[in-house]
């Protein structure tokens, strides 16, 4: 499936915030200039229209989870069919993706690296190898690194990076065994406050 393979810092600069597309816990400002748009002579951002604000929020979330527009819109349509607030449903669907859960558990330093681990069958779900990054993880599912992949240096490094991030309340991880349990779908209060999912709903509702 097609993926963006260009500079990840460029995407974060475009959205004006760290999308955590690079490994490590350094703030974006130490890696690239968040206040300027991409390009050698990036210009300061002007005032956006309502549509522009909505579009930038959608792009920010879509790029954070590493999805193409068609995929992201499909998640929105599914979220709209579910009971409850569409915006919250959207975030819960995104957070329940297998590649994202692998990232949240700290087995991958980034979502892109976590997706690669899944694609290469380095991840087990309830004891079975699964190579579908979009697989929706359910409560109680056990996610583990495959035995022959446990000594990969990138996984060791990722766990070290994850230890410096705030705890993820909806997963339970045993770093020594390199396995974890998806305890529950996260509530809205568990997720970043700087995401305004209502802007995405407004954009797609037009």
From Swiss-Prot:
Superkingdom assignment: Bacteria
A GO cellular component annotation in the UniProt record: small ribosomal subunit
InterPro entries, alphabetized: Ribosomal_uS4, Ribosomal_uS4_bac-type, Ribosomal_uS4_CS, Ribosomal_uS4_N, S4_RNA-bd, S4_RNA-bd_sf
Record-level GO BP terms: ribosomal small subunit biogenesis; translation
Keywords: Ribonucleoprotein, Ribosomal protein, RNA-binding, rRNA-binding
Residue span(s) of domain S4 RNA-binding: 96-156
Pfam family, one: S4
One example GO MF annotation: rRNA binding
Function: One of the primary rRNA binding proteins, it binds directly to 16S rRNA where it nucleates assembly of the body of the 30S subunit.
Similarity comment: family membership: Belongs to the universal ribosomal protein uS4 family.
Subunit structure, interactors included: Part of the 30S ribosomal subunit. Contacts protein S5. The interaction surface between S4 and S5 is involved in control of translational fidelity.
Protein name: Small ribosomal subunit protein uS4
Organism: Teredinibacter turnerae (strain ATCC 39867 / T7901)
Lineage, opening ranks: Bacteria, Pseudomonadati, Pseudomonadota, Gammaproteobacteria, Cellvibrionales
The encoding gene: rpsD
